[in-house]
Structures are given as structure tokens and as C-alpha cells.
């Protein structure tokens, strides 16, 4: 299973949020470029970067910093946050980003998602963020009436190969991932699934790996040292 150390960017710094609440923000590193390089040096093989400013503004804000993180870390990166037009997708992918995550627009602008998938294939991932099973958009500020599984099935029909699923109620809480929802997704959609939210320990990563998922994202637990990079490297190499 691929494990992605997470770097969330706000005002040019690495931060962690609690349940997606921007008022509950903790700065974990003032230098995101050094953070990206540190993860890579310690064995990370793929980074997950979120432009939180971009998610709020609806356009990429931290482009320059993200490019420097990629060139410094010298490993693949996937990026999300505020990507809502083909021009933005083009810019990221043409600048060397390996995969872009279309979040809010996956729900609000399915034609854009379809066009991006047709143009770039596996370089496009869909981000589904849900609270109590209902999809949230615009930096998690708006909660829709759309069920997470229904949206995942729509994404599969569009041709999306990778879905990143975040349980907002667990994000940044260290209460463990939502194994039930991930197992439900695994059963009903045949795409690469990446779990996000709540990972608190190596045991959580192992439990996700045993579901047969493509990947998992580790954030707060890494910064709090409840998971080490050596844990990540070892879990990635075990066949569950």
C-alpha cells in the first residue's frame, strides 16, 4: 500500500487542522520546502500536498512553493486544493506535478472532471470529502445532500482511476480511520482508493492495508510522532 505523508499549506506554512476547521489550525513547520525534503530523505516515496488557501479561494495560491517542494524532494507529488479549471490542471501537470486532485469541482462541475480525465487519464484523481457520509465542498465549508458512495460511483463511470476519500469528522483527530466506509467503497467501486482522515498509529495503517486499498494518507500522527517514517516504509513493503 502506498502511504502519502501529508503537507497542508496555509499562508506559506505547513499546518494541520482539526476536523477541517480553519480556526483550529496548528503550524507544524514554517518551511514547507524543508518539510518535503525531510519526508523524502526519511524514505517517503510520494507526497500529498493540499493548498488550503486555494481550497478557500477557488484557485491555486501556493503554486510556486509547491513547485519548489517537488523539485527539492525529488519524489512524486499529488496536489489538491482549489483546482477548478482546465487551465489550472494544465499548469500543475505541465510544471511537473504527478497527479492533481479535483475535489469540489468533482461534484459541482462533472463536465470539467470528465474533460480532465479524458485529457490526462491517471494523472487526475477525484477527492471526496464527507461529513457523516455527505459530501462537503469549498474547503469543507458547504455540506451537500449527496452520499459519498453515490458520488464515488459517478466518478467511476466518468473514468476516474483514483479516489481520495476523507472522513472530515476524523481528520486531524487521531481517532482512527473510518474502516467501515473504506470497506464499503472497496466493495462497490473498482478504482484505486486512498484513505484520508483519522490515522493515528501503525496499526491503523496496517488495518487499511488489509482492506486491500491502494493508499493511505498520514498527517497529524506523523507530525506528533505517533507514526514514524520507518513505520511507513515498512508497512509499504508488506503484502497484507
Curated annotation (Swiss-Prot):
This is 1-(5-phosphoribosyl)-5-[(5-phosphoribosylamino)methylideneamino] imidazole-4-carboxamide isomerase. Belongs to the HisA/HisF family. Its EC number is 5.3.1.16. Pathway: Amino-acid biosynthesis; L-histidine biosynthesis; L-histidine from 5-phospho-alpha-D-ribose 1-diphosphate: step 4/9. Keywords: Amino-acid biosynthesis, Cytoplasm, Histidine biosynthesis, Isomerase. The keyword Cytoplasm applies. GO terms for biological process: L-histidine biosynthetic process; L-tryptophan biosynthetic process. Coiled coil: none annotated. Transmembrane segments: none annotated. GO terms for molecular function: 1-(5-phosphoribosyl)-5-[(5-phosphoribosylamino)methylideneamino]imidazole-4-carboxamide isomerase activity. It is an enzyme of class 5 (isomerase). It is found in: Cytoplasm. GO terms for cellular component: cytoplasm. It catalyses: 1-(5-phospho-beta-D-ribosyl)-5-[(5-phospho-beta-D-ribosylamino)methylideneamino]imidazole-4-carboxamide = 5-[(5-phospho-1-deoxy-D-ribulos-1-ylimino)methylamino]-1-(5-phospho-beta-D-ribosyl)imidazole-4-carboxamide. The active site is at residues 8, 129.
